[in-house]
Amino acid sequence: MKEYNVGYCAGVYDLFHIGHVNLFRRAKEKCETLIVGVLTDELVIHFKKNPPYIPFEERLQMVESCRYVDRAIPVTFDNIGKIDAWDQLHYDCFFSGDDYSGNEVWMKEKRLLNERGSDIYFFSYTQTTSSTKIKQAIEAQIRKEM
């Protein structure tokens, strides 16, 4: 039996890469059912001020096709917060990369989840690849070709 019944993680998952797969694999090793939230284009634009490279429906399909993911759902303004998502899904653990482990807001949310019988678990961040690094490499190549 695994440590958690239902696990949840959420993200943009633009330019899907090995870091995303590592997160899903590690999360699935700890839970029976893994639900992954994918931020809508509207949310990405709201928070990052730029649209994702890959449209929402395609990002959702890529996440759904990953063998470690049991269910992929849209993340909207109604369920962007970890507590709002918990109210809808009643997950036992929220999984994330450790790049957020010292974040004050995340620690507050961890306490609120603990009060509901849930937790946040941080995995080591995949250092070699990130969407940001991929975007920077693409942009550098475009500038070089101009």
Question: At which residue positions do the language-model features occur?
Answer:
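Nucleotidyltransferase catalytic core that binds NTPs
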Residues: 1-146
